[in-house]
């Protein structure tokens, strides 16, 4: 009976998922007109104090943007991006406190 109880308790441990990037707008590798916002949507709610994103141009220069983290998304508000290539680098932490990092690129058309 004790073995059965121990087996049941071991099987009942919580399953933790990580806050992985589910979608982005603009999408990775997309060519778009200058976007008013960049939205990253994750697979679970984020810990705002430990999640964020940065935007850089093709030369790697950081582009200043307003940022918002709430629920399962990160929103960047760029101001008039010029034509060219851009890279979004993000980091997310969900309720399991595991940090995930990633990036994607997109192009702004003339």
Predicted regions and their residues:
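Cleaved targeting-peptide boundary
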Residues: 17-25
